[in-house]
């Protein structure tokens, strides 16, 4: 059940500290072991990247990033993170669909996500939301972890 006080909006620089904290709470799911506020501010300033936050009563409880290439109609989802106590309530799905709608409005037709193979919760989340496996990359990360690539075509999205 999604609380009514939920809001999704574009990232602003005041959110950087909250994103760093959220990342540190789930760092085992990310390729980067540690990130800084400067790192977040740098990627958020890219023209081909958008970061959205989801808030509950004004407090950041999750975020999603999208890297998009309008000229070729492709995008990549990631990172995505929801504070652990709010998982399983549809909040991540709402955030994902917000990002997918953003991409659809920009003419993106193909979206991928890459997930560490042992992150079964994320794999189930994306499969539940219509993504299908299309590739397996052995020792893909700096630490030698395997990664699974999933994809979804944007017109399949019920945004």
PLM region spans:
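Conserved catalytic-core motifs of GNAT/GCN5-like acyltransferases
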Residues: 114-115, 132-148
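Acetyl-CoA-dependent GNAT
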Residues: 10-14, 20-79, 83-85, 96-98, ...
């Amino acid at each position: 059940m999604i609380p009514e006080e939920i809001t999704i909006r574009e990232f602003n620089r005041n959110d950087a500290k909250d994103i760093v904290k959220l990342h540190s709470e789930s760092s085992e799911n990310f390729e980067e072991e540690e990130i800084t506020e400067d790192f977040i501010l740098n990627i958020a300033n890219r023209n081909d990247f958008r970061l959205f936050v989801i808030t509950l009563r004004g407090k950041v409880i999750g975020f999603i990033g999208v890297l998009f290439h309008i000229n070729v109609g492709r995008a990549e989802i990631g990172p995505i993170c929801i504070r652990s106590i709010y998982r399983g309530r549809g909040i991540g799905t709402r955030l994902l669909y917000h990002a997918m709608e953003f991409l659809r409005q920009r003419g993106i037709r193909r979206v991928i996500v890459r997930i560490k193979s042992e992150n079964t919760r994320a794999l189930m989340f994306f499969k539940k939301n219509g993504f299908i496996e299309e590739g397996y990359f052995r020792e893909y990360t700096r630490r030698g972890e395997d990664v699974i690539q999933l994809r979804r075509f944007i017109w399949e999205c019920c945004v």
